């Protein structure tokens, strides 16, 4: 669309070219660097640099936050921490200080626009490629959540400008100008784009936009140079024409200053002419009612004009309005073509004195800073290249006063209050910061309004609730949201989707049928246009790039296989603008393919945002994806337990599960259909509900490492990883990241390709009405519902290993650990248990009985498969109580020895000892073992139920419990095949009577006899009736142990908090159902290992050994040795025993007793060592005191002090030091401060003088400086002194001459007087009188003049002959004539004065005395040249003569000397001749 306004005013109004505005230089404004030359590396360097229109820095002043976008991440930090970074120590020669932000949001693509809304509720981002908007809730960001609140699409168009509304009450509106020239208006409250008369595009051909000061209307700068005024819904209110006499220019930037005052910046459009420069105008509109408006255009000089116009600049204008006392407007202008910051000002009082006051007051002026040191200029890059701003923002969050705001004013120490800050981010990622200093404000004691958080903070209004059919949107747009009311039907997205239950339909397109347009193999849906679904409006247009924020192809609601992000496959299909049901896209900001715009939060989605994993996602685990292979019966991605993010190594010592911040909710049952907020659930959600949020980050790590089963095929590992580390667990049966309510099992799309829907008949292992723990976080150990775990989950998340125990863990098959009995390896039983997971409650396990055979776990020792019994048992079990803790799946443990014979020699030795003790009773033990086991298992079930109740609380507390340790303690004894350790209080694991248990492979046993994770819920009836009260655990008491289980007796693990997970339930189930067939009465065949073990027992009888802890002897020696005093406490020793496990083939009871004995001994040893450490520490601090007590000097060596000297220290501090400090305290504080102030002022003056002296010394010492100084012309003062000196010298010469004359006269008179006296004497010679002498002189003078005339005539004649060769004749100075001499006339016309002739006789010494320095004819340079330029014979060099000439000259000289000698001799002979003159002569 083109507009041709020419110079016509809007509505026929007039257009006037006003007078150009002034340019002034002022000292009343300036910038003060925050910390000298210091800069901060806020983000990494951009390469290639961002677009010139990028705006990558924004500050929320009231909350004190700053956000800056780098090429790889968005950095969010507090402004205070950034300011402190400026004051950090300098690193080397670089002035750039490093900085680590409080929050960092890694991004897969680059950002082009970033801004906080005016109410500081949202941080809005836009991608450099594909555009779109992504909004983050600022409050959630500050709490560590990194999920976006929502996203909006911009039709695949990249943003040129993002202009949030400036008023907090209207902060929901955000103007968007795209690079295609389209103007959109985003309504963040409704999370959609405002639809105007022409749809979402309010106007095309727009180049920029700006809001009014009250945020009620906005103006749009057009590509043709004109401006439109409109309302946020696109209704046009006014039109401002293009400035007159302006060529092909577009509006680059516009600022709405007042209702009728605008500032515009026009740039040439596609111009190659370097003379086409940026043009600034202040437009004033006058309009009387009923008449068209008149516009006055006044030009302003460019405050940031580039030196070389080699590129079209992009300008950013920041405004400080009403800066008291007199500054009405201060506009800070930055340009991408210049590294400096320019100023435009409007002041009530003149800021400069060299212009008329009325010309520069109350009008805008281009303001230059007179003091270069107070200018703001970006630093050079490391390679000394110029940089340019990519982000400019005002910091009004400071609360500190500024030291020396006006450096030249020594009287002002601090500013009256905080100052506005200007922050500029350049393309190197370096942040420069200055304080904006208004001198008049500093001196008047005023502060800029709104600074330091003084402005009223308008609370951010929450986004309107979405339609009831959609899940509540979490603060960070957790895609895990489920239908708010548990509606199994997919909910439509709040924006862009078909209306559902009042959901507002997207203005961008009509709802279309769900299509199956999923990303192609390896094609990320992020940032790519989605294929319109059937019936989908193709708003983006054919071939147009769709915003990466909300891109997604339309597809069924079923999640793509391995898909992550916010586009849940099983959720209500969402749509990007123009698509009714978008396919779940993985990756990209718009992996929220199923969401309207940029992730409709209203619909539960399952894709992972490329921006971050859901809070429930593992820290570094990939976003949730379909967690099962293609053959799985459970398509929902969330059904798979997330694979550990940190490999499969076992956990380190410590609780596997950390405290759940939302533990209070963990105990609650998930509510059907309740939406799960990514952060509402807290950390540590129910393991069983993959759709539920994972546990805390710590839990995720721990749980990840407990998986013991091998990972599944790659398809499940292709899930994209979250850019932001989630703080939630990874392997707690990872809560379904984004619920996949599989409404239609369509093909699953994934970044790596699409796979056909798996088990479409079972859209979700979690029945569509899934309980959501989002609002009611579930304990990590919460009951696991079959729906939550697909068989893939079980396989993927193998048995969570106990904290690292090389011996016990190695003995157990995956899932066989005593402490992990509740979570035996997800083997066939586990898979079978939940092959059908569509319902809320677990289905009978019998149905899945055959499945385990398909995937046997590692070494299957015995093929006897009482699995059927186990499965039947599971089938009999009711649904696991949602409140019962569930053992989370975790990282797979280290490989486990498969055969009991592989036990170490030490184990065998111990086993032999046990056999020796129980030798002949083995067979009886086997028979009795069944009975005992049955009773004990029943007791364990009861105990299990109690533990289940307590487990929730303890799981919330993050304690694994000694149950885990003991499980490992017992696990060594369970090395009988896959035997799972029993609870010592109830049964002795490892009894040969139970050896039949070992005949069943561990995986099978686990699979057969346990629920998904092997736990018995407290709601589930015991498989076997309780057999009486629980036996007391033989384990020693522990303050951290609640319910003690038999599994706690493992000797090889340090005691831990009670593991309240219902581990024993699985063991009991396994042992009863699998080994003894207590439920079904089936017994497996006799374990072949039993015979071998019996033979081994016979051998052990002969080689009976005493059961001894291998470390016991050394520890006893240490305990019996003398206690050595020490001043440092040794580290507390926990029971980290690494004793070799007991050998298999022993009776349960003896084996358990031995384990218990070793464990107790180990604990006692550790207690002794800890006690010894305390004794050494106490002894050291009681015996190493300084004799005679401590003195003040001892304070210099704090390490030498001991605890018993604390009293000396207290006395010293309270008495001696206190008195000395009091004595040294400054009494006259004010006087001292005044003296210091005076000294400071004097010091400043001295420093200034020192600097002057240093410059003076340099000028006198440096030869170059001296030469330069001499070459400089004389100053006016020096010239005056020179002239005065010349006048004085002339006067002195005149006086001297007069004195000489008077002296001569005096001598003459004396001579006359002597002569008179001499006549009286006889024969006295007469002396001539004065008169006679005067007459003689006059006569001689006349004779000389006569001769002079003759000489002049002769000179003239000679000149005619030779002078032409000596110099140009006829010129005033060509023949040596001095300045002012008379040029000779034509031949015969008279001679010239011989005074100026080069042949003139030198003046007598007397006459020279009458000459002043300025009276010489050659005083001028030309005269000097004339006087000295004419050559004379005497000045001819000897080398210039020939040999002949030399002989001639020598001969002449000889004659002359001879003549002179003859003259002297003659005069000597004649003697003096006295001539007497008469008076008449």
Curated annotation (Swiss-Prot):
It holds the Pfam family Beta-prop_NUP159_NUP214. Keywords: Coiled coil, Membrane, mRNA transport, Nuclear pore complex, Nucleus, Protein transport, Repeat, Translocation, Transport, WD repeat. SUPFAM superfamilies: Nucleoporin domain (SSF117289). Residues 607-647, 662-991, 1385-1404, 1414-1443 are annotated as: Disordered. PXFG repeats lie at residues 483-486, 493-496, 519-522, 524-527, 532-535, 559-562, 644-647. Residues 903-955 have a biased composition (Acidic residues). Residues 663-677, 773-794, 837-850, 862-877 have a biased composition (Basic and acidic residues). It is found in: Nucleus, Nuclear pore complex; Nucleus membrane. GO terms for cellular component: nuclear membrane; nuclear pore. It is a peripheral membrane protein. Functions as a component of the nuclear pore complex (NPC). NPC components, collectively referred to as nucleoporins (NUPs), can play the role of both NPC structural components and of docking or interaction partners for transiently associated nuclear transport factors. Active directional transport is assured by both, a Phe-Gly (FG) repeat affinity gradient for these transport factors across the NPC and a transport cofactor concentration gradient across the nuclear envelope (GSP1 and GSP2 GTPases associated predominantly with GTP in the nucleus, with GDP in the cytoplasm). Contains FG repeats. FG repeats are interaction sites for karyopherins (importins, exportins) and form probably an affinity gradient, guiding the transport proteins unidirectionally with their cargo through the NPC. FG repeat regions are highly flexible and lack ordered secondary structure. The overall conservation of FG repeats regarding exact sequence, spacing, and repeat unit length is limited. FG repeat types and their physico-chemical environment change across the NPC from the nucleoplasmic to the cytoplasmic side: PXFG repeats are especially abundant in NUPs on the cytoplasmic side. This is Nucleoporin NUP159. The lineage of its organism: Eukaryota, Fungi, Dikarya, Ascomycota, Pezizomycotina. The gene is NUP159.
């Amino acid at each position: 669309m083109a507009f041709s306004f020419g110079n016509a005013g809007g509505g026929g109004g007039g257009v006037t070219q006003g007078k150009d505005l002034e340019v002034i230089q002022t000292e009343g404004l300036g910038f003060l660097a925050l910390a000298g030359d210091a800069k901060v590396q806020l983000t990494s360097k951009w390469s290639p640099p961002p677009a010139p229109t990028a705006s990558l820095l924004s500050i929320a002043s009231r909350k004190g936050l700053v956000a800056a976008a780098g090429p790889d991440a968005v950095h969010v930090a507090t402004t205070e921490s950034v300011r402190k970074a400026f004051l950090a120590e300098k690193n080397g020669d670089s002035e750039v200080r490093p900085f680590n932000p409080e929050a960092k949001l890694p991004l897969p693509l680059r950002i082009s626009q970033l801004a906080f809304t005016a109410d500081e509720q949202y941080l809005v981002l836009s991608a450099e490629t594909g555009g779109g908007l992504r909004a983050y809730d600022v409050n959630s960001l500050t709490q560590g959540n990194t999920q976006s609140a929502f996203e909006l699409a911009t039709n695949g168009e990249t943003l040129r400008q993002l202009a949030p509304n400036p008023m907090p009450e209207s902060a929901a509106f955000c103007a968007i100008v795209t690079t295609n020239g389209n103007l959109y208006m985003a309504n963040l409250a409704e999370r959609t784009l405002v639809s105007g008369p022409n749809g979402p595009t309010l106007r095309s051909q727009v180049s920029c936009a700006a809001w009014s000061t009250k945020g009620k209307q906005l103006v749009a700068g057009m590509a043709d140079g004109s401006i439109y005024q409109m309302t946020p819904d696109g209704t046009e209110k006014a039109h401002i024409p293009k400035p007159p006499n302006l060529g092909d220019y577009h509006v680059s930037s516009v600022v709405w200053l007042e209702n009728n005052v605008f500032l515009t910046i026009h740039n040439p459009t596609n111009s190659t002419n370097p003379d086409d420069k940026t043009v600034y105008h202040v437009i004033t509109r006058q309009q009387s009612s009923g008449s068209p408006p008149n516009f006055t255009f006044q030009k302003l000089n460019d405050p940031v004009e580039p030196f070389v116009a080699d590129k079209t600049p992009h300008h950013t204008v920041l405004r400080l309005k009403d800066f008291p006392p007199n500054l009405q407007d201060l506009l800070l202008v930055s340009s991408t073509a210049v590294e400096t910051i320019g100023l435009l000002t409007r002041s009530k009082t003149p800021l400069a004195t060299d212009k008329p006051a009325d010309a520069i007051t109350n009008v805008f002026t281009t303001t230059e800073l007179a003091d270069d040191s107070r200018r703001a200029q970006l630093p050079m890059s490391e390679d000394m290249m110029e940089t340019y701003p990519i982000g400019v923002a005002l910091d009004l969050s400071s609360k500190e006063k500024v030291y020396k705001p006006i450096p030249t004013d020594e009287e002002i120490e601090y500013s009256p209050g905080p100052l506005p800050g200007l922050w500029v981010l350049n393309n190197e990622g370096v942040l420069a910061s200055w304080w904006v200093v208004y001198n008049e404000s500093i001196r008047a004691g005023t502060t800029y309004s709104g600074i330091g958080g003084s402005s009223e903070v308008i609370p951010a209004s929450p986004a309107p609730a979405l339609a009831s059919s959609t899940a509540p949107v979490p603060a960070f747009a957790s895609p895990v949201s489920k239908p708010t009311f548990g509606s199994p039907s997919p909910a439509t997205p709040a924006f862009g989707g078909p209306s559902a239950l009042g959901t507002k339909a997207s203005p961008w397109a009509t709802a279309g049928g769900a299509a199956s347009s999923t990303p192609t193999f390896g094609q990320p849906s992020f940032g790519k246009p989605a294929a319109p679904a059937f019936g989908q409006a193709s708003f983006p247009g054919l071939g147009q790039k769709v915003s990466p924020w909300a891109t997604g192809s339309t597809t069924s609601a079923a999640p793509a296989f391995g898909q992550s992000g916010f586009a849940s496959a099983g959720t209500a299909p969402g749509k990007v603008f123009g698509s009714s049901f978008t396919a779940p896209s993985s990756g990209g900001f718009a992996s929220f393919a199923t969401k309207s715009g940029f992730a409709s939060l209203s619909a539960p989605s399952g894709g992972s945002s490329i921006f971050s994993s859901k809070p429930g996602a593992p820290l570094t685990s990939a976003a949730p994806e379909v967690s099962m292979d293609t053959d799985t019966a459970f398509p929902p991605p969330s059904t798979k337990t997330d694979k550990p993010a940190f490999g499969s190594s076992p956990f380190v010592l410590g609780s596997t599960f950390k405290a759940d911040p939302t533990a209070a909710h963990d105990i609650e049952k998930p509510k059907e259909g309740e939406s799960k907020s990514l952060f509402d659930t807290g950390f540590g959600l129910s393991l069983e509900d993959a759709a539920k949020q994972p546990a805390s980050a710590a839990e995720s790590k721990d749980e990840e490492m407990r998986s013991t089963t091998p990972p599944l095929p790659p398809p499940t590992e292709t899930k994209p990883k979250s850019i932001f580390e989630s703080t939630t667990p990874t392997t707690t049966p990872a809560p379904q990241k984004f619920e996949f309510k599989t409404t239609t099992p369509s093909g699953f799309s994934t970044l790596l390709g699409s796979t056909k829907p798996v088990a479409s008949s079972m859209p979700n292992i979690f029945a569509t009405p899934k309980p959501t723990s989002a609002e009611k976080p579930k304990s990590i150990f919460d009951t696991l519902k079959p729906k939550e775990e697909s068989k893939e989950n079980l396989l993927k998340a193998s048995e969570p290993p106990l904290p690292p125990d090389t011996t016990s863990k190695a003995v157990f098959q995956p899932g066989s650990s005593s402490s992990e009995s509740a979570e035996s390896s997800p083997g066939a039983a586990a898979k079978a248990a939940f092959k059908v997971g569509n319902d809320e409650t677990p289905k009978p396990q019998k149905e899945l009985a055959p499945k385990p055979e398909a995937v046997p776990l590692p070494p299957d020792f015995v093929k006897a498969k009482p699995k059927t019994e186990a499965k039947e048992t599971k089938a009999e079990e009711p649904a696991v109580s949602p409140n019962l803790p569930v053992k989370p799946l975790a990282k797979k443990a280290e490989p486990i020895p498969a055969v009991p014979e592989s036990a170490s020699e030490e184990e065998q030795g111990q086993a032999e000892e046990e056999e020796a003790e129980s030798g002949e009773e083995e067979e009886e033990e086997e028979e009795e073992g069944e009975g005992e086991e049955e009773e004990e298992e029943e007791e364990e079930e009861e105990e299990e139920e109690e533990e289940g109740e307590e487990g929730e609380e303890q799981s919330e507390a993050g304690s694994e419990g000694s149950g885990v340790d003991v499980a490992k303690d017992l696990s060594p004894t369970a090395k009988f095949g896959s035997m799972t350790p029993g609870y010592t209080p109830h049964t002795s694991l490892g009894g040969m009577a139970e050896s039949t248990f070992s005949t069943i492979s561990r995986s099978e046993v686990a699979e057969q006899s346990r629920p998904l994770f092997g736990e018995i819920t407290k709601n589930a009836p015991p498989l076997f009736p309780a057999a009486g009260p629980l036996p007391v655990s033989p384990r020693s008491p522990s303050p951290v142990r609640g319910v003690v289980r038999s599994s706690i007796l493992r000797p090889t693990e340090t005691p831990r908090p009670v593991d309240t997970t219902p581990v024993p339930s699985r063991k009991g189930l396994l042992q009863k159902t699998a080994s003894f067939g207590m439920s079904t009465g089936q017994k497996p065949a006799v374990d072949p290992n039993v015979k071998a073990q019996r033979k081994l027992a016979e051998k052990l009888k002969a080689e009976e050994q005493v059961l001894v802890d291998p470390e016991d002897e050394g520890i006893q020696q240490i305990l019996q040795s003398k206690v050595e005093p020490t001043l440092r406490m040794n580290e507390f020793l926990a029971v980290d025993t690494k004793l070799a496990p007991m050998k298999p083939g022993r009776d349960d009871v003896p084996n358990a007793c031995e384990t218990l004995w070793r464990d107790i001994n180990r604990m006692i040893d550790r207690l002794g060592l800890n006690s010894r450490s305390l004794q050494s520490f106490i002894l050291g601090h009681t015996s190493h005191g300084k004799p005679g007590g401590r003195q003040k000097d001892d304070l210099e060596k704090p390490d030498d002090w001991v605890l018993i000297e604390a009293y000396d220290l207290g006395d010293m501090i309270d008495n001696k030091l206190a008195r000395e400090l009091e004595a040294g305290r400054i009494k006259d504080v004010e006087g001292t401060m005044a003296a210091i102030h005076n000294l400071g002022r004097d010091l400043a003056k001295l420093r200034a003088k020192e600097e002057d002296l240093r410059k003076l010394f340099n000028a006198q010492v440096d030869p170059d400086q001296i030469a330069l100084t001499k070459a400089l012309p004389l100053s006016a003062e020096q010239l005056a002194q020179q002239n005065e000196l010349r006048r004085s010298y002339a006067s002195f010469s005149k006086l001297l001459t007069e004195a000489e004359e008077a002296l001569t006269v005096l001598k003459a008179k004396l001579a006359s007087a002597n002569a008179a006296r001499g006549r009286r004497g006889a024969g006295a010679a007469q002396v001539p009188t004065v008169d006679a002498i005067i007459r003689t002189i006059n006569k001689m003078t006349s004779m000389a003049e006569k001769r002079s005339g003759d000489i002049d005539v002769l000179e003239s004649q000679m000149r005619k002959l030779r002078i032409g060769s000596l110099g140009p004749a006829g010129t005033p100075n060509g023949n040596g004539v001095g300045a002012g001499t008379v040029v000779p006339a034509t031949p015969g016309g008279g001679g010239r004065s011989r005074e100026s002739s080069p042949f003139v006789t030198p003046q007598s010494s007397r006459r020279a005395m009458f000459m002043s320095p300025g009276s010489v004819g050659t005083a001028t340079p030309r005269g000097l040249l004339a006087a000295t330029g004419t050559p004379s014979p005497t000045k001819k060099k000897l080398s210039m003569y020939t040999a002949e000439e030399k002989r001639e000259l020598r001969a002449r000289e000889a004659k002359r000397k001879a003549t002179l000698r003859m003259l002297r001799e003659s005069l000597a002979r004649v003697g003096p001749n006295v001539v007497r003159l008469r008076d008449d002569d």
